[in-house]
Amino acid sequence: MITQTSISYYGLNNVEHAEADFKEMKSHGVTQVILAVTEFDFDFWRPNIPAFVDKAHELGLRVLIDPWGNGKYFGGEQVSKFLQDNVENRQVSALTGEKLPYACFNTNSYRDYFKNFCTTLAREAKPDGCFWD
């Protein structure tokens, strides 16, 4: 039995606009919103993210945070600031030795970065959980 219906939501700069979107989601039977948070959102819009979570909760929606496009390791077309600042921490092809345009989860640098990203959002925004995209 399906107990939750979810929609992904991207664009964390205007909570008033999101409120209207969240109300429309509810009117269509959605019970959970997945907030796609990019590295840019984390660096630039982070102060807004708790307000989005609070607004969704106020309207009766559960909230999952999705670290979308983070390090290009997780899906998404977004630019990775981590990769721009840490080119030595990219994945390397086992077949060709070529450096790939994705963060390498085997490096402590990326693990620390990703852990900080997730724990900071969990602590500050208080979502109901995380969604790995």
Task: Kindly label every feature range from the protein language model.
Residues T3-N13, V33-F44, T96-N116:
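The substrate-binding groove and active-site-proximal loops of carbohydrate-active enzymes
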Residues G11-F42, E124-P127:
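Catalytic domains of carbohydrate-active enzymes, especially glycoside hydrolases
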Residues K26, P50-G60:
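Surface-exposed amphipathic alpha-helices with a cationic face
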Residues F42-P47, Y73-G75:
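Extracytoplasmic/secreted cell-surface and envelope-processing proteins
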Residues V53, I65-A125:
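Active-site-adjacent "subsite" loops/lids of carbohydrate-active enzymes
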Residues P127-D133:
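Charge-patterned, long linear interaction tracts outside catalytic cores
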